[in-house]
Amino acid sequence: MAGFARQYRLGATSPALWRYIAAIHNRADITLAPSSAAVWDLRSHGVENVVRWMRGVDAKRFNPEHRNAELRHRFSSRGNKIVGFVGRLAREKQVDRLVEVAALPGVSLVIVGDGPCKDKLEKMIPSALFTGFASGLELSQMYASFDVFAHTGVDETFCQAIQEALASGVPVVAPASGGPLDLVQHGHNGFLWNPAKRHTFVEGVNELVTNGESLKFCASNARASVEHRTWDSVMSELVGHYRAVANGLSLAYSGASK
């Protein structure tokens, strides 16, 4: 919420918003946050007893086996590297950053999703393929048919789309802020770019699309970096938190470093 306030130029409301958030959460025994960055953000604004509880991913649904030759031909009949984005086309996602990616030689850009900024983005990036909203098998095939997944928004508390791309065997270029910091290991399963230096975003994408060895290495590590994070395992962790609170162990969470 505070991140959205920044994007929509409501900065003056942020202190009041954080006080409101803290007042609500401090009535609970613990607060579960989806990423290390979210834990830090909440604690630094007065929220107590915060514990990281990351999200799971369906590694069967999001799988390299869904890579589809016909779909790849639709995305790029010229044999270009396919760079994809999946998400809501709204201001806070900062999808306009993809303008520079679309200009890279040998790249075909695919934007999956819908939202209030779609018409504007279609005019800004006429060379991109806008698929609209996708779900189910269609979405699984789209993820697996990308060569690179590029994420633009810098205010993500987690970013499930990154997990889904990685589970699909696709290396990721994402901002070194918020949730992506827990998901992307720089140079291992993708690249992190500096939000303060806009050019590092397109540089990260360019490294993968022009360096075959780098692309192959990061792609080979992508799925393994998240496939252990099944929904069964993360829900078991959640049940453990419930049990701890039910047994009166909430004080043990104070200052927890998870």
Functional labels for PLM-detected ranges:
Residues G11-R67, S77, F130:
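Donor nucleotide-sugar binding/catalytic pocket of nucleotide-sugar-dependent glycosyltransferases
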Residues S76-G106:
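Conserved donor-binding/catalytic core segment of Leloir-type glycosyltransferases
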Residues D119-L137:
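Nucleotide-activated donor-binding/catalytic signature segment of Leloir-type glycosyltransferases, i.e.
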Residues F133-A134, Q141-F146, L238:
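Short alpha-helical donor nucleotide-sugar binding micro-motif in glycosyltransferases
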Residues V154:
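Aromatic "clamp/platform" in nucleotide-sugar-dependent glycosyltransferases that forms part
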Residues P171-A174:
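Short hydrophobic beta-strand element within catalytic cores of glycosyltransferases
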Residues H186-G187, F191-R198, E207-G212:
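Conserved acidic donor-binding segment of nucleotide-sugar-dependent glycosyltransferases
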Residues S214-H228, G240:
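A short, well-ordered alpha-helix in the C-terminal region of glycosyltransferases
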